[in-house]
């Protein structure tokens, strides 16, 4: 249901209006062009959708080389807006303000509070959450398969301090900002819909970067049977 005369649309890429004249269009996680399930939608929007005044692709630095091949006349400069592909394009890379450190392996029983543990199947997520419940008193759960209402309730359970731990899939890396000091991977492999594969470095960085935000330093590491990150 879209309200009459809505001034803003906050929506998924698939549901965003493409038949309206909008002054501003912003698309987050533009590197999802490479995703095997949703990449065709991101690519179509990258190529064809523009705001009348401003178009912004967040995460676009990872797409710089690809966008550079779309037109011979593209120039990359520092302080102009991101506009049409045949005009000047600016890539702004904002450095992280806090320090993110790799701390190696740690047993779940020794992991400190304000920690997220990452797994890549519902079975793993629930098993780890149950282990934390027995050892430490409880954990919130975040998975992409949860309904928005349930996921938000779990996020609030953690953010309110009712529980000190979070167990999540890689859904935590997309648009969820929480008060985390640590992120630990219980696995570095995921099933991507076609095959079981290792996480690439950008995926590891996206998830690990949930630890510490703004001026607060963060740590990431591995736990359980997970092999060392190399």
Where does each model-flagged region fall?
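Conserved helicase motor
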Residues: 1-3, 11-16, 121-123, 141-153, ...
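Short glycine-rich substrate-engagement loop in P-loop NTPases that contacts/grips substrate
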Residues: 2-14, 97-104
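Conserved RecA-like ASCE ATPase "motif II neighborhood" in helicase/translocase motors
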Residues: 6-29, 35
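Loop/turn-to-beta-strand initiation segments
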Residues: 6-8, 21-24, 51-57, 114, ...
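SF2 helicase motor core recognition
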Residues: 12-21, 46, 125-126, 166-185, ...
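Post-DEXD/H (motif II) to motif III coupling segment of the RecA-like Helicase ATP-binding lobe
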Residues: 24, 31-100
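Conserved segment of the helicase C-terminal RecA-like domain
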Residues: 53-54, 59-65, 178-230
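Conserved strand-helix element at the start of the C-terminal RecA-like helicase core
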Residues: 55-58, 111-135, 139-143
């Amino acid at each position: 249901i879209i309200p009459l005369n809505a001034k803003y649309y906050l929506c998924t890429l698939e549901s965003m209006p493409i038949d309206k004249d909008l002054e501003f269009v912003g698309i987050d996680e533009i590197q999802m062009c490479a995703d095997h399930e949703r990449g065709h939608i991101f690519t179509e929007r990258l190529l064809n959708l523009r705001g009348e005044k401003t178009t912004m692709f967040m995460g676009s630095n990872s797409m710089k080389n690809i966008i550079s091949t779309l037109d011979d006349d593209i120039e990359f400069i520092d302080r102009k807006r991101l506009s049409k592909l045949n005009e000047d394009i600016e890539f702004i890379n904002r450095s992280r303000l806090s320090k993110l450190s790799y701390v190696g392996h740690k047993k779940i029983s020794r992991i400190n509070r304000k920690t997220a543990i990452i797994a890549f199947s519902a079975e793993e997520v629930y098993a780890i959450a149950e282990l934390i419940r027995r050892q430490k008193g409880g954990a919130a759960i975040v998975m992409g398969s949860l309904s928005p209402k349930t996921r938000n309730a779990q996020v609030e359970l953690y953010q309110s301090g009712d529980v000190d731990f979070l167990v999540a899939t890689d859904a935590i890396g997309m648009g969820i900002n929480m008060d985390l000091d640590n992120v630990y991977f219980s696995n570095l492999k995921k099933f991507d819909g076609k095959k079981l594969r290792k996480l690439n470095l950008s995926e590891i960085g996206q998830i690990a970067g949930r630890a510490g935000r703004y001026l607060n330093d963060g740590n990431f590491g591995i736990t359980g049977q997970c092999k060392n990150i190399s």
